[in-house]
Amino acid sequence: PSVFVYGGSIMPGEHPDGRKLDIVSVFEAVGAHAVGDIDDDELLSIERAACPTIGSCAGMFTANTMAAVGEAIGMSLPGSASAAAIDTRRSDIAFASGHAVMNLLRLGILPRQIMSRGAFENAIAVVMALGGSTNAVLHLMAMAFEADLELELEDFNRVAARVPHLADTKPHGKYHMVDIDR
């Protein structure tokens, strides 16, 4: 039996002018600095403010995408993917996950019984709706292989054709994983 417990994402930083910052802000600032659009002080200001807490990258990159997959596929508790790493609910999530895994043990339920073909399709739908990382394709195909299920690239295309992209999340959008939690 198994329950996946995600550690949570970092909180976005804040520039002195009020702009939300994250690791992508640093990448963009390094580029802007290289071409002379911002000075050393501005670059340093962004670097110091962009990553203020512990946790995975704030946007819909691989870690947050796969945390959402964990919920969608049934291997994590509902609501556990979007709480930030510093959120006080993290302890409650871990404790409840411990109870859940003990219940799965008592019932004899194994991951392969949870991660059905339908669960994988649900996970793909969540990835598409969130605009998740393309790495989810590789990870989900590897997980399906371990679960002794067939999953093809065409399955992703088929699900993507019927599921709209709903979340305006970084790196392609405006919001961070903690905003999904709100």
Which ranges hold each PLM region?
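Active-site cavity-forming subdomains of large catalytic enzyme subunits
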Residues: 1-122, 127
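Terminal amphipathic helices with adjacent charged low-complexity linkers/tails
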Residues: 5-12, 71-99, 136-182
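Catalytic-loop motifs flanking and including active-site residues across diverse enzymes
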Residues: 61-65, 133-139
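Catalytic cofactor-binding cores of redox enzymes
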Residues: 121-132, 145-147
